[in-house]
Curated annotation (Swiss-Prot):
Pfam families: Tetraspanin. Its main location: membrane. Residues 47-61, 116-228 are extracellular. It comes from Danio rerio (Zebrafish). The gene is tspan18b. PROSITE patterns: ALBUMIN_1, TM4_1. Belongs to the tetraspanin (TM4SF) family. It comes from the Eukaryota. InterPro entries: Tetraspanin/Peripherin, Tetraspanin_animals, Tetraspanin_CS, Tetraspanin_EC2_sf. The chain crosses the membrane at residues 26-46, 62-82, 95-115, 229-249. One of its GO terms (cellular component) is plasma membrane. Keywords: Glycoprotein, Membrane, Transmembrane, Transmembrane helix. This is Tetraspanin-18B.
């Protein structure tokens, strides 16, 4: 076998490898494109949802900000996936370099956000919701979205307060209702007793632990959604992995293009 034949075979193998990287990069970027489209769809649905979820989100600044963060991330991933697909198919070095720099910035930002969210998840979340409950929960004002949402949560999950019934101490609820230790939504229900369904409403409102729900809603909701939280965490790891591979493929393709 001559040197020319060996060189030609090496060039052919290099070309095949480059083509493989190009199509792998296209596949990974198409997945990023689909992920961005999904986040955009979820964000738009929450913003325009006519069933009332829009009002709940609008009433809570944290949720309101979160929806627009989802929209922004969805838009960036949508654009990122599109640029990556175009750069791979067209073998455009400028597009590939721009794609690499953009996805590197997003990757580092997502990684930092995930680490911070994991480190501060419990302390900040409990602290925030407890503070908001004390400031805004009114008890029986069902025209107030914040109050009606909390009533629905406490009735659905048979819980009381964020951490415990003691969260209502020194709250606006106690100022409005000084004779009640906890709101009616905290009272235990028994559908076989009377029309109201309460085991003993009066004893509950006066503070008796026997007739109220003593578990905090934070723990109750986290326990209920525990599986979904792990799924969300797994999806975040998958997204970060896809982005990492996309960066590697982009740089390999960039270096391989003559």
């Amino acid at each position: 076998m001559g040197l020319g034949e060996a060189s030609a075979r090496g060039t052919s193998m290099e070309g095949d490898c480059l083509s493989c990287i190009k199509y792998l990069m296209f596949v990974f970027n198409f997945l990023i494109f689909l992920g961005g489209s999904f986040l955009l769809g979820v964000g738009v649905w929450v913003v325009v949802d006519p069933t009332g979820f829009r009002e709940i989100v609008a009433a809570n600044p944290l949720l309101f900000t979160g929806v627009y963060i989802i929209l922004a991330m969805g838009g960036m991933l949508f654009l990122l996936g599109f640029l990556g697909c175009c750069g791979a198919i067209r073998e455009n070095k400028c597009l590939l370099l721009f794609f690499f720099m953009l996805i590197l910035i997003i990757f580092l930002a997502e990684l930092a956000a995930a680490i911070l969210a994991f480190i501060f998840r419990e302390h900040l979340t409990r602290e925030y919701f407890t503070k908001e409950l004390k400031k805004h929960y009114q008890g029986y004002n069902n025209t107030d979205v914040f109050t009606s949402t909390w009533n629905a949560i406490m009735n659905t999950f048979d819980c009381c307060g964020v951490n415990s019934p003691e969260d209502f101490e020194e709250s606006i609820f106690r100022i409005i209702n000084p004779s009640e230790m906890v709101p009616e939504a905290c009272c235990r229900r028994n559908n076989h007793v009377g029309e109201s369904g309460f085991s003993n409403r009066e004893e509950c409102l006066s503070g008796s632990m026997l007739y109220r729900n003593n578990k905090g809603c934070y723990s109750a909701v986290v326990d209920y959604f525990e599986m979904y939280i792990y799924v969300a965490g797994a999806l975040a790891i998958v997204v970060l992995t896809i982005e990492l591979f996309a960066m590697v493929f982009a740089m390999c393709l960039f270096r391989g293009i003559q």
